A protein has these predicted regions:
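Detector for outer-membrane/organellar transmembrane beta-barrel domains
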Residues: 89, 113-174
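Residue-level detector of solvent-exposed, low-hydrophobicity positions
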Residues: 51, 62-64, 91, 98, ...
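Outer membrane beta-barrel
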Residues: 1-100, 114, 123-126
């Protein structure tokens, strides 16, 4: 937005200072649930990652630390994502669709391009302080080498589960 309005000192060509932030909009209804679109936490992160991302925010064992880039491959703050959440009884049910995105240049001469994807997840509240979550994320992407013309399509899948127990002032997660 700052670039579109030429706001001085709020935008620099080529800068990526705010590209890891979230920017999304949505609608919420007590009856129908929540529908959002934009760059936001993925279903996988909401259901699995957030439970274990509590110690020093290192994310080493999480999907964004294993994929090419969490903003592009759908594992963290996914860009161009439509996400739905609905609470039914003791369960929070999630679904998302990842739209095709622009190319990501990882710095090694290759080009990564997400073609699409989606996620499903559930957070089941076993008790008021014990929650079990499971999520699956699928991303279809192309990796291209412009130097030699090589190209390959990938079907990326992430499947994970996490348990969070928060009795009194304590937090345990796995």
């Amino acid at each position: 937005i700052p670039a579109q309005f030429n706001w001085d000192h709020h935008y620099a060509d080529g800068a990526h200072d705010t590209s890891r932030r979230m920017l999304y909009t949505g609608l919420k209804s007590d009856t129908w649930g929540t529908l959002t679109f934009g760059q936001q936490n993925s279903v996988y992160y909401d259901v699995v990652g957030a439970k274990t991302d509590i110690w020093d925010y290192d994310m080493i064992g999480q999907a964004p630390g294993n994929g090419i880039n969490g903003d592009y491959d759908g594992s963290y703050r996914s860009r161009q994502m439509l996400k739905y959440k609905k609470t039914v009884g003791d369960a929070d049910i999630y679904a998302s669709y990842l739209f095709e995105d622009s190319e990501y240049l990882p710095g090694n001469g290759l080009r990564y391009k997400r073609k699409g994807g989606g996620s499903l997840g559930i957070d089941y509240h076993l008790t008021t302080d014990l929650t079990w979550g499971a999520a699956w994320n699928y991303t279809r992407a192309d990796m291209r080498n412009p130097d030699n013309g090589d190209s390959k399509s990938y079907d990326q899948n992430i499947l994970g589960t996490a348990l969070s127990w928060t009795p009194d002032n304590w937090t345990f997660s796995a």
